[in-house]
């Protein structure tokens, strides 16, 4: 290839996008197949034979496809699901609040027991020892 030659690029192969080439091949194959089928059915008609794919009786019982649910039913289902979700959240929040409340009552009761003191102002050891024993039992269980 000489730089002075104007036709030097014409001799090179043209760039072919593989995707485009593949899609063109597929289209070509589909049209060819469709043409073959069309000619086949034309030949059958000329010979007076019925097409193989179609049943002889037009009144054959065909299974009816289930129709999709309409907008109102879908909206009702969505509304019901939202309501169930809301109730579930509400129940979980209620349970959480009850648990927090019971824990705070327990803490207040313990605090009152641990505050008890003798007439001279010394703290009572009985409730403190019981509290420590309860803590040890909880640690052993878990």
From Swiss-Prot:
InterPro entries in the record: Fyv7/TAP26, Fyv7_fungi
Pfam families from the UniProt entry: rRNA_processing
Positions in coiled-coil regions: 94-116
Extent of Basic and acidic residues compositional bias: 99-115, 131-142
A GO CC annotation given for this chain: nucleolus
Function text: Involved in the processing of the 20S pre-rRNA.
The protein's name: rRNA-processing protein FYV7
Taxonomic lineage from the root: Eukaryota, Fungi, Dikarya, Ascomycota, Saccharomycotina
């Amino acid at each position: 290839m000489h730089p002075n030659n104007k036709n030097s690029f014409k001799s090179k192969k043209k760039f072919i996008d593989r995707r485009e080439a593949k899609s063109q091949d597929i289209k070509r194959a589909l049209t060819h197949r469709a043409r073959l089928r069309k000619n086949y059915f034309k030949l059958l008609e000329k010979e007076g034979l019925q097409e193989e794919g179609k049943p002889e009786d037009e009144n054959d019982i065909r299974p009816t496809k289930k129709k999709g649910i309409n907008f109102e039913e879908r909206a009702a289902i969505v509304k019901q699901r939202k309501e169930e979700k809301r109730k579930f959240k509400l129940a979980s929040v209620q349970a959480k609040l009850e648990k927090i409340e019971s824990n705070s009552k327990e803490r207040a009761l313990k605090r009152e027991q641990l505050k008890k003191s003798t007439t001279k102002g010394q703290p009572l050891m009985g409730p403190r020892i019981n509290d420590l024993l309860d803590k040890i039992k909880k640690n052993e269980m878990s």
